[in-house]
């Protein structure tokens, strides 16, 4: 499982010109799965994201997590995080997880985040989406469960 976390001031996702999800300050997550991912990966990444202290405290130090600042999450599925680019100029996506399983993992992951009390907006798994955001910082963190 791979997740790119971007701290944002605001973000939204649209599908076919219609806004599907929007947040004010919080995180934009780009989420990808590979075959073999399961509940252990979801638990690990959800814990890391919910406890990630990249929001400023009163002294301007990155010391607060998303729950402490009342932030929200915009979660976007993105199989292209598993692009293979070592050979040629056109990426291969064979390392990305089976779409049927990945869709279930994506839904479970978002439910797990929401169960913590954080508002979670989503795109649509497998859809062609337009994502817009205002990066804050910018702060971008990459998680890969193969590297834990």
Swiss-Prot record:
Catalytic activity: glycyl-tRNA(Ala) + H2O = tRNA(Ala) + glycine + H(+); a D-aminoacyl-tRNA + H2O = a tRNA + a D-alpha-amino acid + H(+)
Main localization (coarse): cytoplasm
Subcellular location: Cytoplasm
Gene Ontology molecular-function annotations: D-tyrosyl-tRNA(Tyr) deacylase activity; Gly-tRNA(Ala) deacylase activity; Ser(Gly)-tRNA(Ala) hydrolase activity; tRNA binding
Superkingdom, taxonomy of origin: Bacteria
GO biological process, one term: D-amino acid catabolic process
Keyword match Cell wall biogenesis/degradation: no
Cellular component, GO, one term: cytoplasm
Intervals of motif Gly-cisPro motif, important for rejection of L-amino acids: 137-138
InterPro entries on file: Daa-tRNA_deacyls_DTD, DTD-like_sf
Entry keyword set: Cytoplasm, Hydrolase, RNA-binding, tRNA-binding
The EC number(s) this enzyme carries: 3.1.1.96
Record's comment describing the protein's domains: A Gly-cisPro motif from one monomer fits into the active site of the other monomer to allow specific chiral rejection of L-amino acids.
Function recorded in the entry: An aminoacyl-tRNA editing enzyme that deacylates mischarged D-aminoacyl-tRNAs. Also deacylates mischarged glycyl-tRNA(Ala), protecting cells against glycine mischarging by AlaRS. Acts via tRNA-based rather than protein-based catalysis; rejects L-amino acids rather than detecting D-amino acids in the active site. By recycling D-aminoacyl-tRNA to D-amino acids and free tRNA molecules, this enzyme counteracts the toxicity associated with the formation of D-aminoacyl-tRNA entities in vivo and helps enforce protein L-homochirality.
Alphabetized HAMAP family for the sequence: Deacylase_Dtd
Matches recorded under PANTHER family: D-AMINOACYL-TRNA DEACYLASE 1, D-TYROSYL-TRNA TYR DEACYLASE
Stated family: Belongs to the DTD family.
Assembly and binders: Homodimer.
Protein name: D-aminoacyl-tRNA deacylase
Gene of this entry: dtd
